[in-house]
Amino acid sequence: MTSHPASDGLFESFRRAEMLIARSRPLDALQALGPVLESQPNDASVQLLAGRAYLNSAQLRLAEEAFVRVLDLDPSDHYARFALGKALQRQGRLAEAHAQLKMAAAMDPRPEYQEALGELRVRMAAGQPDETGN
């Protein structure tokens, strides 16, 4: 999110939401982010921050929607793809999570992406069913 004189209040709300997420207060972050989401729903950084807050507050479907929106706006965002994979995994949608985590790791081979992909593969190999029972 970029700061413009007319949007300084929104920028401050965005920064406050970032700080609240860093302090493990995702619900407060979502409250601070509300006006920014209303005003700038097509800003990938705003959607990404909302997705992180939703994920950290176990609002998994809303997190999924936010990360999908980020990827609609910026398909090259490897972190959004990684976070989408984590949201899908937490919903028990392992095959979908695997596809997203695999793409994130291919886009940027960060250790945390590789580790998450490895852990998911172990879970899938152990036969833990996804939400469809497969």
Residue locations for each model-derived region?
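TPR-adjacent "capping" and linker segments in tetratricopeptide-repeat scaffold/adaptor proteins
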Residues: 1-12, 131
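Structural signature of tandem alpha-helical TPR/SEL1-like repeats
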Residues: 23-31, 35, 57-69, 91-103, ...
